[in-house]
From Swiss-Prot:
The gene is GLRX. It comes from Gallus gallus (Chicken). This is Glutaredoxin-1. Disulfide bonds join C23-C26. The keyword Transport applies. Keywords: Cytoplasm, Disulfide bond, Electron transport, Redox-active center, Transport. Belongs to the glutaredoxin family. Residues 3-101 form the Glutaredoxin domain. Has a glutathione-disulfide oxidoreductase activity in the presence of NADPH and glutathione reductase. Reduces low molecular weight disulfides and proteins. PANTHER family: GLUTAREDOXIN-1 (PTHR46185:SF1). InterPro entries: GLR_AS, GLRX1, Glutaredoxin, Glutaredoxin_subgr, Thioredoxin-like_sf. The keyword Metal-binding does not apply. It is found in: Cytoplasm.
Amino acid sequence: MVDSFVQSKLRDNKVTLFVKGSCPYCKNAIVLLKEFNFLPGCLEVVDITGMDDIQDYFQKTTGQRTVPRVFIGTKCIGGFSDLQKMEQQLPMMLRQIGALV
């Protein structure tokens, strides 16, 4: 059930952030990504507050339990610090998956 929930949120041409509302790193990731001009439906923020089973799933599948979990297309690129490190590459990556206007 957790696997199908997570997989239902991922698409090749979309960026998906799994976040918790009280997490400052999650808020920073959202701010960073909202600087880009995404096509409608190509940026989704999924609040998993209170869903520890999803974090357990991420531990098994990505090696990390922390949030945010950032997916570009169907690939997990990590958390906020990983997103920051890739900031210069993001425009090209987002264009490659067809997520930008």
